[in-house]
Amino acid sequence: MKRLISTPFVFLLGLNALVSAAENPRIVLTPLRGHLYVVEDYFYLKENSMVYVGDSSVTVIGATWTPETARLLADEIGKITPKPITEVIDTNYHPDRAGGNAYFRNIGAKIVSTNMTNDLLKVHWTEMVRYVQKGFPSYPTLPLVAPDKTFAGNFELQDGGVRAIYLGPSHTPDGIFVFFPKEKALYGNCILKEQLGNLDFADLTEYAKTLQKLKQLNLGFTTIVAGHWSPLHGPELIDQYLQLLSAKDRSKSGAN
């Protein structure tokens, strides 16, 4: 694993901590369309997750930052449906995607991930919690809660209404996209957002290749939900992020 913290990342975290505090940290659940809801989690560094309300149960995509944020999300879900939360997908091994595991397990949900995410959680969880605490000292020291069920690669939940897709390393080695075919929506996870964001754990050699593979799938989605900052974007977000990666690469080359 790379060095624990970078000065630019500390600066970024500090700025976002001030913004989040000013906005009164909270969980906001907003309908998108069909079965889908967008979660905006204003705690720590703002992150966006998703909720799929199926015929008989609810699937949460991204466990949010902590057991407390997970509880707040569950409360919001309870306002829109009496259906139980039965599955929670850890979309990568970082705390913003797996920190709420303990709460969800306690209410009876199964934690789901790829084998790779499960392996990385078991090896790096304590280190990742300390990493977050460098930028956010109030972040709790959470024990590892590993997934209950894992998959070797791509998987489907909710009778195919929720499709997890792994295409290669990007923001992390293990990050997945989640596609919702009926709603023509894609959850971009931490892989896609309007800013470059934290690249301390990114594979900058493979990142653009992974995004090109996503484009080549021609999934036909009309909405991308970004993992951080503003949630709602069109398919053009992929090319926008590719441009950000390319500009960073040119800047690095120019400095040599």
Task: Explain the meaning of each model-derived region.
Residues 11-20:
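Hydrophobic h-region of N-terminal signal peptides that target proteins for export
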Residues 235-256:
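Binuclear metal-ion centers of metallo-dependent hydrolases, dominated by the metallo-beta-lactamase
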Residues 35, 52, 62, 77, ...:
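Divalent metal-coordination and catalytic microenvironments
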Residues 30-75, 176-190:
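Conserved beta-strand hairpin/beta-sheet module of binuclear metal-dependent hydrolase folds
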Residues 23-26, 30-32, 57-59, 65-66, 118-241:
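Metallo-beta-lactamase
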Residues 1-9:
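Bacterial N-terminal signal peptides that target proteins for export
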Residues 55-57, 67-112, 217-220:
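Active-site metal-binding motif and surrounding structural segment of the metallo-beta-lactamase
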